[in-house]
Amino acid sequence: MPSRTIGNRQLKIENRQMIVGTGVDIAEVPRIAQAIARYGERFLRRIYTQAEMRYCDSKANRVERYAARFAAKEAAMKALGTGWNHGVRWVDCEVTRQPGGRPTMKFHGKAAEFASRLGTHNIALSLTHTAEQAFAQVILES
């Protein structure tokens, strides 16, 4: 196990993770509601995975949930450093839930390739939303 000396103290470093990318985004809930009303299933299938749609549609405040996931996908692309210009599709970034309900993210396709290049081994995701705004933060760790 690696160790490090600080002053006269020897510290053991068990799990050394480095942040390799961060991203944040805010989505306006009314704009997501308008997109769903205007484009319906076409919009939903382009942006969200089937599992994400099942989850959001099972909740009373479904549009807030969709907006939070939209913000998470935007934040993930910022963390990866790709934007949407390098063949990454919206559905390549999927918000899932850990046992106990904590949100996390899985990368697929091109997003997974970029995450691998960064040496990503852990994805920390935080979501929050109100009736008006949804916020997401993504931290990629090696």
Regions found by a protein language model. Name each.
Residues 17-142:
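Core catalytic alpha/beta fold that binds nucleotide/phospho-ligands
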